[in-house]
Amino acid sequence: MTHNQRVGKWGEEQAALYLGQRGYNIAARNVRTPYGEIDLIADKDGQTVFVEVKTRLSDSAGPPETGVTGRKQSHMMASAEYYAQEHDLEHWRIDVVAVQRLAGQTDVVHFENAVA
């Protein structure tokens, strides 16, 4: 596993813990679709939440959420629509969780309905 893969897995774990503490049930991780991978799939209050996790260990490239480009959003939407259709889901949304570790402190920011 590469350094970036380890960082990504660590960030996904931090995001899952954060969401779990806020009442989300993590139903699946790293789900592949023909359009890309969905990092986390969670359920809360009868709604399925597709979660893109962005992780950074420095601020040199800006905050993690800036990594969610227009192209990435298109892939996220296509992946979510594919999964929702395959699983007959009516109520769903796409969130982004940004995880950043600076000076020994981990910050997690949750953006609900980040892609519409």
Residue ranges with predicted function:
Residues E86-A116:
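Domain-level recognition of nuclease-like catalytic cores that cleave nucleotide substrates
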Residues L19, I38-A61, G70, M76:
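Conserved catalytic cores of phosphodiester-cleaving nucleases, focusing on short active-site segments
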Residues M1-R29:
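Acidic-basic catalytic patches of nuclease active cores, encompassing PD-(D/E)XK
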Residues R22, R29-N30, K44, H110-A114:
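Secondary-structure boundary/capping motif
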Residues N25, T48, H91:
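Hydrophobic "anchor" residues on beta-strands that sit immediately upstream
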Residues D59-E90:
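Mid-chain, well-packed structural core segment of small domains
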